[in-house]
């Protein structure tokens, strides 16, 4: 900086160098600093507001999650006792005996309406009527004119029926003459079905549900018997809100000894279920495998050796006897054959033994603890024993 550029300050001596002034740019820098501080403060305030807002949302979400966890979707279940039976109504007084109805005459048969006028040569005879109106029958003796009228009426009816039958036959022949296309143009008529709503789905176990169950008893199809199983999965209502059959409930049933050759399943009918709370309901539903197949599979004992063992042994004895007979017969002429006719008797014994044992039925065994299914064959309504109480 040269000497000429330095302004002369008052109160200084000539030739003395004074301090440079800073007042020219001081006000501009102050405004910039204040603007910067204002912007920084505004950003800090926005950040604080954003932090408070996010914290409030997090607390609200936590509170709503806690409320959702504490609130159960399954309403509380209570039991209600059935109402006491109403008292028997008093016996109604006996009505007075109705007066006897007057006897009404029985009309003559309708065939008399078709009577024709008598011929000139015929002399109508007088009707001889035996009136028994008080009884259930009335005997009427008709004259020859009435007999002719009856015959004429029967002839008219037969003629009319013959004409109607001829008309129907002609229509049938017309349809047959139309060919196979006319027959195909008539579809099968089916009945319509109306939709309906299920009653109170909160306490309804709908038809078609499958109950998973574990056998408590061993099944042996030698003789008919009873069976029991334990429910292994909770069963809820049709809308999934109310627990109807708890896990651990006992189901009882029965089976028949009807296994035949070629069959690998046994039919079991499950009749009743009892819950741990003492609720019982009739099932009357068939047993199934875990996938819903009809019947319960198991181990099959076909009793092969019992059925064919005796016949095989007798056949073997017969074969060995014939072989020995041939050996003995070919040894020389001085040998005596003592087995003459023995082969036929042994064959008869084998046939008899096979006839007695061939019809032994197979036996199915199924051990306890195996998983089975029960196909619900009807809608089960628990509304008479269960009720829901709002929280």
Curated annotation (Swiss-Prot):
Function: The VirB system could be required for the establishment of the replication niche in the host.
Full protein name: Type IV secretion system protein virB10
Residue intervals passing through the bilayer: 33-53
Pro residues bias: start-end ranges: 81-103
One protein family per Pfam: TrbI
Family: Belongs to the TrbI/VirB10 family.
UniProt topology in membrane: Single-pass membrane protein
Highest taxon of source: Bacteria
Keywords, alphabetical: Cell membrane, Membrane, Transmembrane, Transmembrane helix, Virulence
Keyword Transit peptide part of the UniProt annotation: no
GO cellular component, one term: plasma membrane
Ranges for region Disordered: 1-26, 76-105
Gene name for this UniProt entry: virB10
Remaining remarks: Transcription of the operon is maximal in early exponential phase.
Keyword Membrane listed: yes
NCBIfam families linked to this entry: T4SS_VirB10
InterPro entries recorded: T4SS_VirB10/PtlG (IPR047695), T4SS_VirB10/TraB/TrbI (IPR005498), T4SS_VirB10/TrbI (IPR042217)
Induction text: Specifically induced within macrophages by phagosome acidification. Induced at 37 degrees Celsius in minimal medium, suggesting that nutritional stress is a regulating signal.
Compartment(s): Cell membrane
């Amino acid at each position: 900086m040269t000497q000429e550029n330095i302004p002369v300050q008052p109160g200084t001596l000539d030739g003395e160098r004074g301090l440079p002034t800073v007042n020219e740019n001081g006000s501009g820098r102050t405004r910039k600093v204040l603007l910067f501080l204002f912007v920084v403060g505004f950003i800090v305030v926005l950040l604080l507001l954003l932090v408070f807002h996010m914290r409030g949302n997090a607390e609200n979400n936590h509170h709503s999650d806690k409320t959702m966890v504490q609130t159960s979707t399954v309403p509380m279940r209570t039991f209600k006792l059935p109402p006491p039976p109403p008292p028997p109504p008093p016996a109604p007084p006996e009505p007075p005996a109705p007066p006897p109805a007057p006897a009404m005459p029985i009309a003559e048969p309708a065939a008399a309406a078709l009577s024709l006028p008598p011929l000139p040569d015929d002399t109508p005879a007088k009707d001889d009527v035996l009136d028994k109106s008080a009884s259930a029958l009335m005997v009427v003796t008709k004259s020859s004119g009435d007999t002719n009228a009856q015959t004429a009426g029967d002839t008219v009816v037969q003629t009319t029926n013959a004409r109607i039958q001829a008309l129907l036959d002609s229509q049938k022949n017309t349809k047959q003459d139309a060919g196979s296309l006319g027959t195909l143009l008539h579809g099968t008529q089916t009945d319509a079905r109306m939709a309906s709503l299920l009653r109170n789905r909160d306490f309804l176990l709908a038809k078609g549900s499958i109950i998973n169950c574990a056998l408590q008893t061993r099944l042996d199809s030698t003789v008919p018997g009873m069976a029991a199983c334990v429910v292994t999965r909770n069963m809820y209502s049709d809308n999934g809100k109310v627990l109807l059959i708890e896990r651990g409930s006992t189901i009882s049933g029965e089976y028949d000894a009807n296994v035949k050759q070629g069959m690998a399943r046994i039919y079991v009918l499950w009749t009743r279920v009892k819950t741990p709370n003492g609720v019982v309901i009739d099932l009357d539903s068939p047993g199934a495998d875990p996938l819903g197949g009809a019947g319960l599979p198991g181990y099959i004992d076909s009793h092969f050796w019992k059925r064919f063992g005796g016949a095989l042994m007798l056949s073997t004895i017969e074969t060995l006897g014939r072989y020995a007979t041939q050996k003995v017969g070919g040894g020389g002429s001085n040998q005596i054959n003592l087995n003459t006719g023995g082969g036929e008797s042994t064959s008869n014994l084998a046939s008899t033994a096979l006839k007695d044992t061939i019809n032994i039925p197979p036996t199915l065994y199924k051990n306890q603890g195996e998983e089975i299914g029960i196909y619900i064959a009807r809608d089960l309504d628990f509304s008479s024993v269960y009720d829901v109480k709002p929280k």
